[in-house]
Regions:
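Short alpha-helical transmembrane segments in multi-pass integral membrane proteins
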Residues: 1-19, 77-144, 186-230
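Residue-level signal for short hydrophobic patches within transmembrane helices
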Residues: 8, 12-31, 35, 58-65, ...
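Membrane-helix interface/capping residues of multi-pass secondary transporters
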Residues: 37, 46-49, 86, 115, ...
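Interfacial/gating helices of multi-pass transporter permease domains
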Residues: 40-60, 126-131, 191-192
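Membrane-helix boundary and inter-helical linker elements of multi-pass secondary transporters
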Residues: 42-45, 79, 158, 185-187
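Small-residue-rich hydrophobic transmembrane alpha-helices
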Residues: 49-109, 146-165
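Hydrophobic transmembrane alpha-helices of multi-pass small-molecule transporters
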Residues: 61-64, 108, 176-180, 206-210
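Alpha-helical transmembrane segments of multi-pass membrane transporters/permeases
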Residues: 100, 155-178, 196-199
Length: 230
């Protein structure tokens, strides 16, 4: 199994090759909302466009929390992989999936409960707040997809593969744009359609990462014997 190894060869080029996809990936994750805004602004009017901007601010508060958690998980993955403890790596993956998934569900519920108070705190006009809430209810309902993409990306980063998660994200960006045009421009689903496009695109990124992991790094995916809560 070939992975990046900073202990061999020239270190600076290897650091750049590892860091650049990670940086671009973090930037691209913010572009889901930007793509939605472009399509909404063109096909759903100024109020919906303003709602997307407000929603992006609220959404990022919770996305940064998930991203930070997965960054911490990637450190644990890297420790297990660096010590060649693949059984430990797989069990960490299982525990991260279970407890990270539960944390994400709690975070989703908290986000939904705090949604209206946050929009009020931001002094959002009622017509804009209503549309922003329509968008965010779908986004927060699909927060598990965001978590599992970041978890898969953390697993890939821990073995030195930062490009594959980026490629999956690029494919999801293209799907998001296509689905936005279908749901908003063609089917007239408005701002909720843009949110569904984002969630479905994120699910695609998860599926692509899992397929790649199963094909390239099958020994990293947890098995029945790894499903222990200890």
């Amino acid at each position: 199994m070939e992975t990046a190894a900073l202990t061999r060869g020239s270190i600076p080029p290897q650091l750049v090759s590892l860091a650049l996809p990670l940086i671009f990936g973090n930037i691209l994750q913010q572009l889901y909302n930007t793509i939605d805004a472009m399509v909404i602004g063109r096909f759903a009017g100024e109020t919906a466009f303003a709602a997307i901007g407000v929603a992006g601010t609220v959404m990022n508060l919770f996305l940064f929390l998930l991203s930070g958690c997965c960054t911490g998980i990637s450190v644990l993955f890297a420790q297990q992989y660096g010590s060649r403890d693949l059984a430990g790596f797989r069990q960490e993956g299982f525990l991260a999936s279970v407890f990270g998934g539960l944390f994400t569900l709690v975070l989703s519920l908290a986000a939904l409960l705090l949604l209206r108070p946050l929009l009020t705190l931001m002094q959002t006009p009622e017509d804009v707040a209503r549309l922003a809430a329509d968008y965010l209810v779908v986004i927060f309902g699909g927060l598990l997809a965001t978590f599992f993409y970041n978890l898969c990306a953390a697993a890939l980063r821990s073995v030195g593969d930062t490009r594959s998660a980026l490629l999956a994200l690029l494919a999801a960006m293209a799907a998001n744009l296509a689905l936005d045009l279908l749901f908003v421009a063609r089917l007239g689903m408005g701002i909720a359609g843009a949110a569904w496009a984002t969630v479905l695109a994120q699910l695609l990124s998860v599926a692509l990462c899992l397929l790649y992991l199963a094909r390239r790094y099958p020994q990293l995916l947890f098995r029945r014997e790894d499903r222990r809560l200890d």
